[in-house]
From Swiss-Prot:
Its EC number is 2.4.1.238. It comes from Gentiana triflora (Clustered gentian). It catalyses: delphinidin 3,5-bis-O-beta-D-glucoside + UDP-alpha-D-glucose = delphinidin 3,3',5-tri-O-beta-D-glucoside + UDP + H(+). Induction: Significantly inhibited by Al(3+) and Co(2+), moderately by Zn(2+) and not by Mg(2+), Ca(2+), Mn(2+), EDAT or EGTA. Competitively inhibited by UDP. The N-terminus is blocked. Coiled coil: none annotated. This is Anthocyanin 3'-O-beta-glucosyltransferase. Keywords: Glycosyltransferase, Transferase. An anthocyanidin binds at residues 16, 389. UDP-alpha-D-glucose binds at residues 349, 351, 366, 369-371, 374, 390-391. Abundant in petals and barely detected in leaves. Belongs to the UDP-glycosyltransferase family.
Length: 482
């Protein structure tokens, strides 16, 4: 039998790029010829991440295409959604991505893969794959729960008769009773008013989801069995749950090479953690796209200090104040250093290495799905602080269904990545202490540790994710190609 050749084309944002690279590495480790597609400016991250797989002899490579920045008035070199600082820039970025269909088709014509795995935002990938008679698999970068709950809310609009944005509603037609408020979900009033492009894009995404060959999900059966079953049996959707994809990086070197270069030496970070007791450190990080204003960062610093817990805090550039000395509380950094109470990392951190360390007992997170899964794989309970995208659904999975998280009380969904609503220091301190210093927190942390073992077993030989991938590869290998 000829070697199966699969193209992988992630949406151009770190939260989509990293799991897709992991997926390509996983496929290649199972004998597949894996080819990743990206733009010129993003290629360095891809090449670094696959280097060890190539050394081990796996058939994995990267092809690049040009991103049409200039055609849409975007700055030269602007090739990831993470760089967006306004709604207008994000909209232009999405429009520019539509023009990637033609160069993708040129690569499909030249290299003739047997299947295409493309991100859900590339809804036009169905048409591209159909031109060459190959199946298009849609990569959904969230959980089945979030996918199903969000679809139910979009379809049923259970918020439409509410008198206030803060009034609660129950998400209809799903296995669990999940309560949200209108302000916590994207609604047409907020995301699509005067923006027909966004309306049209989500309509196209929904249609492509229904028409594609099937959906690949970065999750595992034991994490959300009711929703995996619901997806297949009630929605009738062909889906393969092959995660957690980050566990394909089972060597320290793989983990360290994943994503951007850390702004702290990994050994320095791990040495600091080695000096701490098990379950004593709170890790605080809000991913690659979240940007808080100065007032919120000030409250976060005060909340961490008032909690009395040791912490590692990954600080990205503040959106309205480049100099962190302007928003750090007076003497904060000095007190943290002198008391050896915390480690502040400015920029990018080796997140997976940190979460896997036994000293880490809690993860304050925006609930992006990659970060959520990395916390699950590390056996770390979460303080949930969702901001945008599907993150409020991910929060509900952690706090209400799995019961491995405590909410900080975030109430406002936003389309842009800055949060105008300030979560007060008292709420932050209370949530952290509830998880780290109260009896209830012990049970929550124990449930999180049990999930870690289930995640590991899922990707091992005979595990649910391993078996789902095996079934998919058999199916793709027997697909009748032109």
């Amino acid at each position: 039998m000829d070697q199966l050749h699969v193209f992988f084309f992630p949406f151009l944002a770190n939260g989509h790029i990293l799991p897709t690279i992991d997926m390509a590495k996983l496929f290649s480790s199972r004998g597949v010829k894996a080819t990743l597609i990206t733009t010129h400016n993003n290629s360095a991250i891809f090449l670094k991440a696959i280097n060890r797989s190539k050394i081990l002899g796996f058939d994995i490579s990267v092809l690049t295409i040009k991103f049409p920045s200039a055609e849409f008035g975007l700055p030269e070199g602007y090739e990831t959604a993470d760089q967006a600082r306004s709604i207008d820039m994000m909209d232009e970025f999405f429009r520019a991505c539509i023009l990637l269909q033609e160069p993708l088709e040129e690569l499909l014509k030249e290299h003739r893969p047997q299947a295409l795995v493309a991100d859900l935002f590339f809804y036009w990938a169905n048409d591209a794959a159909a031109k060459f008679g190959i199946p298009r698999l849609l990569f959904h970068g969230s959980s089945s729960f979030a996918m199903i709950a969000a679809e139910s809310v979009r379809r049923n609009k259970p918020y439409k008769n509410l008198s206030s944005d803060s009034d609660p509603f129950v998400v209809p037609d799903i296995p669990d009773k999940i309560i949200l408020t209108k302000s916590q979900v994207p609604t047409p009033d907020e995301t699509e008013e005067n923006n027909t492009h966004i309306t049209e894009m989500w309509k196209n995404i929904s249609e492509s989801e229904n028409d594609c060959y099937g959906v690949i999900v970065n999750s595992f059966y034991e994490l959300e069995p009711d929703y995996v079953d619901y997806c297949k049996n009630v929605l009738g959707r062909r889906a393969w749950h092959i995660g957690p994809l980050s566990l394909c990086n089972n060597e320290g070197e793989d983990v360290a090479e994943r994503g951007k270069k850390s702004d702290i030496d990994a050994h320095e970070c791990l040495n600091w953690l080695d000096s701490k007791n098990p379950d004593s450190v709170v890790y605080v990080c809000f991913g690659s796209m979240a940007n808080f204003n100065a007032a919120q960062l000030h409250e976060l610093a005060m909340g961490l200090e008032e909690s009395g817990q040791e912490f590692i805090w990954v600080v990205r550039t503040c959106v309205d104040e480049e100099d962190e000395s302007k928003w750090f509380p007076d003497g904060f950094e000095k007190r943290v250093q002198e008391n050896n109470k915390g480690l502040i990392i400015k920029g990018w951190a080796p997140q997976v290495l940190i979460l896997e360390h036994e000293a880490v007992g809690a993860f304050v997170s925006h609930c992006g799905w990659n970060s959520t899964l990395e916390g699950i794989c590390g056996g770390v309970a979460m303080v949930t602080w969702p901001l945008f995208a599907e993150q409020f659904y991910n929060e509900k999975l952690m706090t209400d269904i799995l019961r491995t998280g405590v909410s900080v009380g975030s109430l406002q969904w936003s389309r842009v990545t800055t949060s105008a609503v300030v979560v007060k220091r008292e709420s932050i301190s209370k949530a952290v202490r509830r998880l780290m210093a109260e009896e209830e927190g012990v049970d929550i942390r124990n449930r999180a540790k049990a999930l870690k073992e289930k995640a590991k077993k899922a990707v091992e030989g005979g595990g649910s994710s391993y078996s789902d991938l095996s079934a998919l590869l058999v199916e793709l290998s027997s697909y009748p190609h032109n």
